[in-house]
Amino acid sequence: MKNNEKVFLLIDTSGSMIENEKRSILKYVYRPFKTIIGDRLLAYSWGDEIKEVSKVSELRMQGKINNETTEKFLNNLEENSHLVIMSDGSFETDIFKKLEKKVNMYFVGIGSDVDKKILEYTFGKNNYFEAYDILNLANWLKREIS
């Protein structure tokens, strides 16, 4: 793997993330993830638009996922990029299935209402992680990009 590889992180900021303390869970799993990956992590808010964020604590949860914006973002990723999605899974999974190039995608389920079966089907059983498993994913990615 290249020494300059980045890990792209999409953080779901849609309105469904307001429910059931998901924002608190998100902050809890983000900190160790950021610490392990370091400056190779590029975090983006993912909702009506996708934009890079520097402080996860300032994210506002509102609106809904914009499929067109998501598709453009995904198509701009380089082949074999590492993409981590932190979400409750309330979005259309077909966008990710349509991706023409190979992108290594991992999903971190946030909240108790995550539909694990659909997400495992979409991203692969080995690419789905519960929030409590974030350290395993982060350490594995660190080895992949080093």
Describe each region flagged by the PLM.
Residues 33, 40, 62-63, 146:
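N-terminal low-hydrophobic presequence detector
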Residues 21, 57-65, 89-144:
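VWA/integrin I-like adhesion module and closely mimicked acidic/polar interface patches used
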Residues 1-4, 143-146:
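Short, Lys/Arg-enriched, disordered terminal segments
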Residues 62-75:
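A short, well-structured beta->alpha microelement
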Residues 35-39, 70-73, 110-113, 133-136:
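Short, surface-exposed, polar/charged, turn-prone segments marking secondary-structure boundaries
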